[in-house]
């Protein structure tokens, strides 16, 4: 399997500057050494991105709307031994009311090789909190260079 290692830096906070801005640096390892298995982003790579978000409080401590955008740089090894570089982008809107949230996200990246390296996705997720358990269901649709759909059902336990 692959391993992601990342670190996030909070650059600005909404409380002090009117907007949350963070930066992330990440490294992705790969579990193979065969170039033939390097399809799209299945091999080792790294990325840097920056995200900005603003939270609009609708009902204090109960309801909020969050808008965010991100952009970055992605680099990975391809199946021909070269590396591909791409510009990453994303937009997200989410709404939270008490313990329930709904979010939609549009994003992807555009590489320079122009061969299977410009996927876009649209994801929507509904989640709810019951005690210390978070239940979620989501749907993801792929466009351009990622012609797949996913239905995601999950749970998390907050310790």
What are these regions, as identified by a protein language model?
Residues 80-81, 87-159:
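Outer membrane beta-barrel transmembrane domains
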Residues 1-85:
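Outer-membrane pore/translocation modules
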């Amino acid at each position: 399997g692959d391993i992601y290692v990342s670190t996030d830096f909070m650059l600005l906070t909404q409380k002090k500057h009117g907007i949350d801005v963070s930066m992330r640096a990440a490294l992705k390892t790969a579990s193979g050494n065969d170039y033939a298995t390097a399809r799209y982003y299945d091999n080792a790579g790294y990325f840097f991105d920056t995200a900005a978000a603003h939270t609009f409080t609708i009902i204090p401590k109960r309801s909020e709307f969050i808008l965010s955008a991100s952009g970055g740089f992605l680099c990975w090894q391809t199946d021909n031994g070269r590396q591909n570089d791409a510009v990453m982008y994303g937009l997200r809107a989410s709404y939270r009311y008490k313990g329930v949230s709904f979010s939609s996200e549009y994003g992807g990246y555009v590489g320079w090789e122009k061969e299977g390296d410009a996927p876009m996705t649209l994801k929507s997720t509904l989640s709810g909190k019951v005690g210390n358990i978070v239940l979620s269901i989501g749907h993801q649709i792929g466009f351009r260079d990622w012609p797949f759909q996913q239905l995601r059902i999950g749970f998390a336990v907050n310790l």
